[in-house]
Amino acid sequence: MAWDMCSQDSVWSDIECAALVGEDQPLCPDLPELDLSELDVNDLDTDSFLGGLKWCSDQSEIISNQYNNEPANIFEKIDEENEANLLAVLTETLDSLPVDEDGLPSFDALTDGAVTTDNEASPSSMPDGTPPPQEAEEPSLLKKLLLAPANTQLSYNECSGLSTQNHAANHTHRIRTNPAIVKTENSWSNKAKSICQQQKPQRRPCSELLKYLTTNDDPPHTKPTENRNSSRDKCASKKKSHTQPQSQHAQAKPTTLSLPLTPESPNDPKGSPFENKTIERTLSVELSGTAGLTPPTTPPHKANQDNPFKASPKLKPSCKTVVPPPTKRARYSECSGTQGSHSTKKGPEQSELYAQLSKSSGLSRGHEERKTKRPSLRLFGDHDYCQSLNSKTDILINISQELQDSRQLDFKDASCDWQGHICSSTDSGQCYLRETLEASKQVSPCSTRKQLQDQEIRAELNKHFGHPCQAVFDDKSDKTSELRDGDFSNEQFSKLPVFINSGLAMDGLFDDSEDESDKLSYPWDGTQPYSLFDVSPSCSSFNSPCRDSVSPPKSLFSQRPQRMRSRSRSFSRHRSCSRSPYSRSRSRSPGSRSSSRSCYYYESSHYRHRTHRNSPLYVRSRSRSPYSRRPRYDSYEAYEHERLKRDEYRKEHEKRESERAKQRERQKQKAIEERRVIYVGKIRPDTTRTELRDRFEVFGEIEECTVNLRDDGDSYGFITYRYTCDAFAALENGYTLRRSNETDFELYFCGRKQFFKSNYADLDTNSDDFDPASTKSKYDSLDFDSLLKEAQRSLRR
């Protein structure tokens, strides 16, 4: 049993009912219903029943494998007479009592659909006489039986295959449920079984069941041998001819039931809350060998699993007709529904994959259309993803440059009163300024808004603080500087190559404008900076005899540092001292035309270095360094206080160092007393402390190792172990560390006592007989007269 969907907005007729029953029987809407409330759940063989439950068409292969061991002719043993009698009984239940709505839940997650009216004409037949099937949506049998209350009585109707068209056309409101009951034969005991099912015609496809849509290459008009399993179809097709029902009925297999589930009743109005909320669940049930009819209380699988492959609910794929072959493997043929009085046949076969791809392709086309409408980005200069600027940007760049030129001409008019031609050019520049402003407003009012705001900010700054060039310098120096700017700024900077900074946008960097100085401007005056274009070949009329000289005049070297120093608010006297005398003499010489560019660039670099050293920023930074000058004190008391602090700190430092030395000495003395110090004598003169430590570390952990070298080659060392036992081990076994080219080590305990002599001369043996008075001279007891007589007596001798 497979899940099928219908793509056309036609009425689901009762063809499916006829296909499920397997016979062309007339519809009898006024027969009594069957009551199954007396059935016991324990009578149901749950193992065989649940084993026959299959949820989708991908399980059809498993279903077919369950009956591979059955005889080939097991379905041919069906008694045709018993089948006809049972079908006659089943035709007695049509359009009886509706299902209680309180026992059925409302499914909010389902998609909406159209409402079928009686204006829809019955579908026309195919050329071979076979009418195409209509749309069908069927809920699951298990879901219906689980959700219905225990005391709810189900109504049963029988559907006829020949009267379905008229029955569909006679509906005056939305098509309601047509319950049906189908009989099946037990393959082993020929025991008749009947299953209660309700068929609810639905017009809207359920998005949850789209993954069960499959296609088949079989045409809508199938062979009689394939139509013998039509009782298992959900969206069934009519019989190819009226002479085939007996042969198909004779070849019928154990019935597979389809039970649609819906909360609606035939008396519901069109505005019912369940009108736009439907569900389609179909359960394939094999009832062979079951003992009862009562379904299980729990489904074998989760009924509302999310379908990761479901397509859009708005997509309506074609209705599929399931025709199982004799091997019971599900095969499906695609048939197209018709509406009105004309028949329309689908061209290519459509499946869930086809619908999904169609939807994704539509989304991708919309995405590509949005991509094509994306504006071009403004990127930076020398990258491979750069895009060329459009014409509007070029127009705005030219307008901004012309505004810069007009501002410079206006400033020249204010600073240079004696130049009449500059005044006239200023007037024309102002007129052109108004024209360009109007043109810029017409071209792009949104993009020129920022430029106009910058002009207003500059005007306010110049109004309150004055022009930056007039901040420090006097009027005369400003006139000279601006005159030099006007003479060679345009001509010189046009000769320079275009320097592209990676951090600058592409606005204006690739233009061939004459005034390159306007490319980089200060925030409020629009003048060129010193950092990027500081030197260039120039033509000056002040210091050179010829106007077209290529040599660097002094105005060239003085202009940029002046502008830089004006920003740093230095004094005007730095201007004269910052000029290079060598460049001045070169520029005044008649032979300056033949000066080489290499010498010129050397002078330029040398000049820049000197300018940097003479700049106020450089001098200020040197003067503020802590090592450039001595500290100054306000008074002598402050100096004395600082000196006392330094002396106190020095004394504290010396005291700490002496304490550390005493601590180390005490530790050494303690190690000597603990017998942890070993004296190692007669070591090689080239022995290092690391080597001696590595060789004696085999006996234990060493805290300290020292080596003392002598000029006579008698070198020695001291090794302090952490533990006394390690020192004893080194003293006893240290001789084993001697190499073949070395003498035996002298190993002793303690520190420096081995250098003391053990035998001393006793100089104090007669100390007891010593009289301090005997050491006194004889002259000490004589007076002056005695001493005089003694002296005279010595002279006579």
Curated annotation (Swiss-Prot):
Residues 292-338 are annotated as: Interaction with PPARG. Residues 101-138, 212-276, 289-376, 543-598, 612-634, 648-668 are annotated as: Disordered. Residues 562-577, 621-630 have a biased composition (Basic residues). Residues 676-752 form the RRM domain. Disruption phenotype: Mice show abnormal diurnal rhythms of activity, body temperature and metabolic rate. The modification N6-acetyllysine is found at residues 77, 144, 183, 253, 270, 277, 320, 346, 412, 441, 450, 757, 778. Induction: Dramatically induced in brown adipose tissue and skeletal muscle by exposure of animals to cold. Up-regulated in brown adipose tissue of obese leptin-deficient (ob/ob) and leptin-unresponsive (db/db) mice. Leptin is required for normal basal and cold-stimulated expression in brown adipose tissue and hyperleptinemia rapidly up-regulates its expression. Induced in muscle by exercise. Oscillates diurnally in liver and skeletal muscle. It holds the Pfam family RRM_1. One of its GO terms (biological process) is mitochondrion organization. Phosphorylation by AMPK in skeletal muscle increases activation of its own promoter. Phosphorylated by CLK2. Heavily acetylated by KAT2A/GCN5 under conditions of high nutrients, leading to inactivation of PPARGC1A. Deacetylated by SIRT1 in low nutrients/high NAD conditions, leading to its activation. Residues 114-127, 243-259 have a biased composition (Polar residues). Residues 349-797 are annotated as: Mediates interaction with RNF34. SUPFAM superfamilies: RNA-binding domain, RBD (SSF54928). GO terms for molecular function: chromatin DNA binding; DNA binding; lncRNA binding; nuclear receptor binding; RNA polymerase II-specific DNA-binding transcription factor binding; sequence-specific DNA binding; transcription coactivator activity; transcription coregulator activity. PANTHER family: PEROXISOME PROLIFERATOR ACTIVATED RECEPTOR GAMMA COACTIVATOR 1 PGC-1 -RELATED, PEROXISOME PROLIFERATOR-ACTIVATED RECEPTOR GAMMA COACTIVATOR 1-ALPHA. This is Peroxisome proliferator-activated receptor gamma coactivator 1-alpha. It comes from Mus musculus.
